[in-house]
Amino acid sequence: MTKPHDFKTKAIIVRKTKCGEADRILSLLTPDLGLIQGFAKSVRKTKSKLSGHLELLCYSEVSLARGKAIDTITGSQTIQSFLNIRNSLQLSAMAFYACELAYHFSPEEAANPAMFQLLLSTLEELDNGSQPELCLKYFEINLLASSGYKPELRECANCHKKLQATINYYSPESGGVICPNCRNTQIGMPVSVNTVKVLRYIQENSFSSICRLKINREILSELELAIRANIRFVLEKEPKALLWLDSLRLADL
């Protein structure tokens, strides 16, 4: 989509970088333009009228002026600030992690309405306090799908035979779950029958449906190991926000 000289867009602030003494460069995830960068002049000054509308996690309507190298933010109005998330360290860590993933999985200026809606819905559900751990798993699995990395969960990702109700293996390198026979030639971590069922259910249903799931700690742990391995394989690195999230989880034990 071609941007006019002056334009408005709804956006979620997914990243901010200091620039100079008082400026910032913001990464904005939008429904119609994809991921775009915006220069926010003097936004770090205490008297800036824009600062409160351009914080990380803010869902805002942003006005920009097109520039040669980077667009300049000329105005912003908050639509939703997710106060419940901001008032909880655990929810904040989860939300920052989701924003970091959205940033890394979104190519610049390539519209992906599904990605935008997924992140917005995830922030709304986290803010509502609806099963935060499951909410994050829903986000991660559907993030992979909306980015072209949808894991194969119904048939072996290597030999393409229907998966049997037995211990199978999750292999990011192969693109999903592989059968025991293919485990001899491919790298994979064991996943139980119930874990594969939960993965399928999350991948194929709405968040309102998965909220009703009752998942024990063992299955949740298997889910986390498999999905994290998949994300790490795609990004070729560990998301930074996971360090904070994991430290909070350990402190809560």
Swiss-Prot record:
InterPro entries: ARFGAP/RecO, DNA_rep/recomb_RecO_N, NA-bd_OB-fold, RecO, RecO_C. GO terms for cellular component: bacterial nucleoid. Keywords: DNA damage, DNA recombination, DNA repair. Signal peptide: none annotated. The keyword Transit peptide does not apply. Belongs to the RecO family. Disulfide bonds: none annotated. The keyword Membrane does not apply. Coiled coil: none annotated. This is DNA repair protein RecO. Involved in DNA repair and RecF pathway recombination. One of its GO terms (biological process) is double-strand break repair. It comes from Dehalococcoides mccartyi (strain CBDB1). PANTHER family: DNA REPAIR PROTEIN RECO (PTHR33991:SF1).
